[in-house]
Structures are given as C-alpha cells and as structure tokens.
Amino acid sequence: MKNKYIEQFEAKQIEGKNVPDFRAGDTLKLAIRIKEGDKTRIQNFEGICIARRGNGVSETFIVRKMGANNVGVERIFPIYSESLESIAVLRRGRVRRARLFYLRDRRGKAARIKELKK
C-alpha cells in the first residue's frame, strides 16, 4: 500500500497527459523533445512497440525500429515522460503476445507484423 502523499503526487504527474491506447505490436510515431545546450528540438522516432511494463507513473514501453544497415534500435520510454511531446498510433498490429522480444532475432520480411482488421 502506497503512502497517500505519493499517490497524490503520482496523480498530479499523470493529470495533464493525453496518452493514446496502444499495445505491443502497434506501430508508433513518437515526437521526442531533445535539449542540446540552450536549444530544444523535436526528433521523431518511429517503430514497433514490443513491450509495455509497469503501471501508473512508472509505466514504460519499448519501441524498436530498424536503423541504417539493418541495425535494430530500441528505446525505452516512460509513458508520462516530459520529453515525450506526442505519441501517435500509425498501425494496429495483430499479435498474440504481450512481449515481442522474438523480433530481435528476425530480419526483413520475417520481422513483419500483420495489421489488425477492424
């Protein structure tokens, strides 16, 4: 059981955030605020969500994309991070797992995920 002050603080952190509903297998486009010196800029990161973990303020998710020379790039983001400007769901994936770590071993067409039909 958490302390009531901690619960109030966490509720305040979550309050203003508008997070879309997404799960493992969905293709996401993230706008990340990057601070370099005294300047800030927005950098996009697009990839497949391979896992979600935790709940509340401490909830995180892992996004994987294939970078240059077919090198996989994975980044872990807290859902309620201040550096996340926006999260957009581009495609809904049809998967039967909550964790898609097997995609780390797949290359090319084998790493594709079917789109969820509406």
Curated annotation (Swiss-Prot):
A Gene Ontology term for the protein's cellular component: cytosolic large ribosomal subunit
Protein name in the entry: Large ribosomal subunit protein bL19
Record-level GO BP terms: translation
One Pfam family here: Ribosomal_L19
Function: This protein is located at the 30S-50S ribosomal subunit interface and may play a role in the structure and function of the aminoacyl-tRNA binding site.
Lineage: superkingdom: Bacteria
Gene3D superfamilies, per database record: 2.30.30.790
The organism of origin for this protein: Campylobacter jejuni subsp. doylei (strain ATCC BAA-1458 / RM4099 / 269.97)
Family per similarity comment: Belongs to the bacterial ribosomal protein bL19 family.
GO molecular function: structural constituent of ribosome
InterPro entries xrefs: Ribosomal_bL19 (IPR001857), Ribosomal_bL19_CS (IPR018257), Ribosomal_bL19_sf (IPR038657), Translation_prot_SH3-like_sf (IPR008991)
Keywords: Ribonucleoprotein, Ribosomal protein
PANTHER family: LARGE RIBOSOMAL SUBUNIT PROTEIN BL19M, RIBOSOMAL PROTEIN L19
